[in-house]
């Protein structure tokens, strides 16, 4: 959620930032609604003070004193009725909060203006890409031919956008998760967490998924939602807390299943493992101070890139433009891995600095030692990485002419010494 005080004091800048996000100016409307809310709040405070004063006087008067006592009783009763009316008005005046809940984060000054992904800025590339490579198959062709990846029978069980992995591909999925967790915990100091994947609506609201993206998640019949990313569970570990400054940055990593309805993705990536309803992902989250969040963003992006470097996968890092950024982010890097079967780069990770946007929603603060003052933390998240898309990249980049898949060197030990994935044999 955005800072209403900042909006009041920076109306022109606020409207300009909204335009960069292709949203109509809202400052005047917000000022109007905020003014109404503040007026009601001030009246409530005045009446509460008057009630306190009159109640104190009433407590010091003999009930048998007659008109004075009865008059004060009537005054207190009238004040209570007025307070009830004002508090009802305040509760019904939800338009301001509803409006603020629909507004995305403000883009950082370094974010380029742009309409869509075609206007993202290239930051760096890593690894060699052979644009002229011939006869490179896509991952689903390879996996099905090896009889280690099943879509047809799985569709009878769960429908479209699901997959079943078997044999050495199932082992590769497990190996990738263990490898990623080892790198993030051992080399980058993230604390491994095993969080719940069923969360309440307020947790989804805190992280920015609700109310705007309700149709993109799966809801149960008893008030829970399946997480679209472990970011939801991890950032909410500090909801409604005050963290000692010396405990920051708080770096967390989790490996969980993720669930997405893929609403609005009809017709996109209908074949293969690129866009599934259920997939596994290693997720990074950091809770830090405003002064450190910029450097922490680079640190987390480096952690994600390191996984691809160790796997020997070519990639490029893009700074997203204003028209392509996520709702809660103020600055995002996308890491795109090269897929020779598709002859294009595809997103494999997003690394976002959300500033205090999520923290304001979930009331997450920190304070310096010996101080009574508190400050909103900054929250950051990064894919570290999605297992399925990483497997896609390995299949396409490490495929051999006979259809087998060479296991990347760093995964051989995780695969029990297996160096090549071949067709499944009964």
Swiss-Prot record:
Binding locations of ATP: 260-262, 347-350
Keywords: Aminoacyl-tRNA synthetase, ATP-binding, Cytoplasm, Ligase, Nucleotide-binding, Protein biosynthesis
Keyword Ligase: yes
Cellular component annotations (GO), alphabetically ordered: cytoplasm
Catalysis: reaction(s): tRNA(Ser) + L-serine + ATP = L-seryl-tRNA(Ser) + AMP + diphosphate + H(+); tRNA(Sec) + L-serine + ATP = L-seryl-tRNA(Sec) + AMP + diphosphate + H(+)
Protein family according to the UniProt entry: Belongs to the class-II aminoacyl-tRNA synthetase family. Type-1 seryl-tRNA synthetase subfamily.
InterPro entries: aa-tRNA-synt_IIb, aa-tRNA-synth_II, aa-tRNA-synth_II/BPL/LPL, Ser-tRNA-ligase_type_1, Ser-tRNA-synth_1_N, SerRS_1_N_sf, SerRS_core, tRNA-bd_arm
Assembly information from the UniProt record: Homodimer. The tRNA molecule binds across the dimer.
Ligand binding (L-serine): 229-231, 283, 383
HAMAP family, per database record: Ser_tRNA_synth_type1
Subcellular localization(s) per the UniProt record: Cytoplasm
Protein name per UniProt: Serine--tRNA ligase
BP GO annotations: selenocysteine biosynthetic process; seryl-tRNA aminoacylation
Pathway: Aminoacyl-tRNA biosynthesis; selenocysteinyl-tRNA(Sec) biosynthesis; L-seryl-tRNA(Sec) from L-serine and tRNA(Sec): step 1/1
Main location: cytoplasm
NCBIfam families assigned: serS (TIGR00414)
Highest classification ranks of the organism: Bacteria, Pseudomonadati, Pseudomonadota, Alphaproteobacteria, Rickettsiales
Pfam families, alphabetized: Seryl_tRNA_N, tRNA-synt_2b
EC numbers for this chain: 6.1.1.11
Biological role stated in the UniProt entry: Catalyzes the attachment of serine to tRNA(Ser). Is also able to aminoacylate tRNA(Sec) with serine, to form the misacylated tRNA L-seryl-tRNA(Sec), which will be further converted into selenocysteinyl-tRNA(Sec).
Gene: serS
Domain writeup: Consists of two distinct domains, a catalytic core and a N-terminal extension that is involved in tRNA binding.
Any one GO molecular-function label of the UniProt entry: ATP binding
Domain of life per record: Bacteria
Gene3D superfamilies: Bira Bifunctional Protein, Domain 2, Serine-tRNA synthetase, tRNA binding domain
